[in-house]
Structures are given as C-alpha cells and as structure tokens.
C-alpha cells in the first residue's frame, strides 16, 4: 500500500492532480473504486482517468447512494464540480475543469462482500482477482480494447481464469453462460485499438490477436479445450 501521494502510479496527469483530495472524501468509505483505475493503481499497466465508485455488499445499513451527501462533500472540495444524474442509483460528477469523471453506482442486485486489494486514505479497491471477474463480465456488455488489454494483464499476473469466469457469471445473476464468456475472450476482432487507448500509455505493446493467443494457451493449459 502506498504511504504518500508520490507513490501513486497509473493515473493520468489530470486525475493525479485531484486524487489526493478525492481519496480523503468521507463519502467514499463504504464504496469500492472499480474499473480500470482500480486495476491501474495496483499494477501500473497503463494510465487511467475515470474514478468509478460502486456501493457493493451493503443493503441493510445503507440501501441507496446518498446523492445529496456525496455531491455536497465533493462540491465543498471542488466548487466547480458539475453533476449528471443517470438514474436513481447512478450519477456522475465532473471535476478539475471537467477533465476528471467520478461515477457513483449501486448495482441493482447486491454483491457479496469484497476483499480489499489496495487502500489509500479513505479509498479502497477490490482485489485483482475480483477485478478480472468484473472485466470479463464487462466485455459481455461492451467491446473496448482497453478491457481486453486489462484482462491480458490480469491473467499475466497469474489471476485465475476459472475463478474469474465463475465470478462474472455470479455478477450477471447467471444470465450469461460460461461458454459465451469464453467465446467472447477468443474473439479479437471485436476489440480494436483506438487513439484513446494509445493516450493511456500502455506498458505493453500487444495486439488483440496476441491477447487471444495468450488466453487460448491459458485455457489449453487448464484443459479447457
């Protein structure tokens, strides 16, 4: 775990500028920082800019996101903050002249208690293993190259694919079949690089086809084919 802000890696310059203040917010204590930033803070495999907070594993003590309290505290630190409400349990807040997006989301269904993978001030992330399951679930909903790249980096860090598939199935409430997830993982044509990805300064230069080949070898090694 980092001891000071100089040890924080994996953020774009705009996000780095506000990260210390965001990490000190009281309103994020019950939330988890998920997504690519939750991974980049632990791996520094690329830069990430969005801060995606999720309310996971809580229902009885705090059934909904407290929009008023969250926005009030953020605006106390960032008076220029602008909000965008996407739904009762999902809203965005833009800070640092709109260059940094904070999202706050509560999944419709409760998520079992998460383990803490990384912590700094009031901010915490899931473990890399849990993030892999989340990423596999995500690519069943959208196809963006950075997610494919993130999955490769997590597998290369020895996260378990079987366990991640099981967790992704759990997140989908078992509506997405394991066979569908494996097929998506072996479909590099769905994941095309774009200019935004190159702006994230990936530490590894790899193509979608090379990622597919790596995943295929991982599956073969575990007797999946």
Residue ranges and their predicted role:
Residues 1-225:
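Compositionally biased terminal segments of proteins
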């Amino acid at each position: 775990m980092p001891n000071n802000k100089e040890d924080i890696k994996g953020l774009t310059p705009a996000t780095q500028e506000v990260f210390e203040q965001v990490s000190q917010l009281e309103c994020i204590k019950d939330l988890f920082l998920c997504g690519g930033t939750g991974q980049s803070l632990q791996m520094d495999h690329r830069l990430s800019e969005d801060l995606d907070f999720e309310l996971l594993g809580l229902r009885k003590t705090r059934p909904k996101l407290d929009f008023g309290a969250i926005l009030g505290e953020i605006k106390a630190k960032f008076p220029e903050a602008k909000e965008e409400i996407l739904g009762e349990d999902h809203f965005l807040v833009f800070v640092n002249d709109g260059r940094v997006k904070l999202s706050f989301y509560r999944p419709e269904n409760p998520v079992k208690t998460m383990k803490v993978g990384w912590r700094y001030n009031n901010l915490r992330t899931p473990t890399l293993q849990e993030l892999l399951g989340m990423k596999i679930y995500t690519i069943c909903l959208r196809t963006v190259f950075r997610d494919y790249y993130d999955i490769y980096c997590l597998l290369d860090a020895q996260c378990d694919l079987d366990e991640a598939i099981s967790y992704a199935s759990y997140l989908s409430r078992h509506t997405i079949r394991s066979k569908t997830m494996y097929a998506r993982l072996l479909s590099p044509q769905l994941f095309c690089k774009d200019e935004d990805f190159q702006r994230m300064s990936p530490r590894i230069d790899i193509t979608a086809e090379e990622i597919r080949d790596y995943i295929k070898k991982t599956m073969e090694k575990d007797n999946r084919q």
